[in-house]
């Protein structure tokens, strides 16, 4: 878990999915982000390369069929830390042999929190 802070906020970020886990208002002593529940355990997932469910859980590109899970795969992958300071953090996910099995494109997805 990564943490960045300002005078007003404390923010926790998961490396898996580069997901915000907590946004805590230090001035009011209050959590500002949904903390999960029985029906939806995530807080603020990064959805890439698709949002939602594809019909049949797949799509076609250049006459080839590719499987795709609900909301894509970014939230299921560990992002690399590019840079992390006291008050900011940049995380990155790049294509791999595994991601190209369901998304046959080169990509670099960066999430930056300040």
Predicted features by range, described:
Residues 1-114:
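Surface-exposed acidic/polar loop and edge beta-strand patches at domain peripheries
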């Amino acid at each position: 878990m990564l943490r960045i802070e300002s005078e007003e906020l404390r923010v926790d970020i998961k490396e898996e999915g580069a997901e915000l886990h907590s946004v805590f208002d230090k001035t009011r002593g209050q959590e500002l982000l949904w903390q999960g529940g029985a029906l939806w355990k995530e807080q603020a997932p990064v959805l890439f390369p698709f949002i939602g469910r594809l019909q049949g859980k797949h799509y076609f590109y250049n006459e080839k069929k590719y499987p795709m899970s609900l909301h894509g795969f970014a939230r299921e992958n560990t992002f690399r830390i590019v840079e992390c300071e006291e008050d900011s953090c940049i995380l990155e996910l790049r294509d791999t042999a595994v991601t190209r099995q369901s998304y046959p494109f080169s990509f670099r997805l960066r999430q930056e929190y300040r």
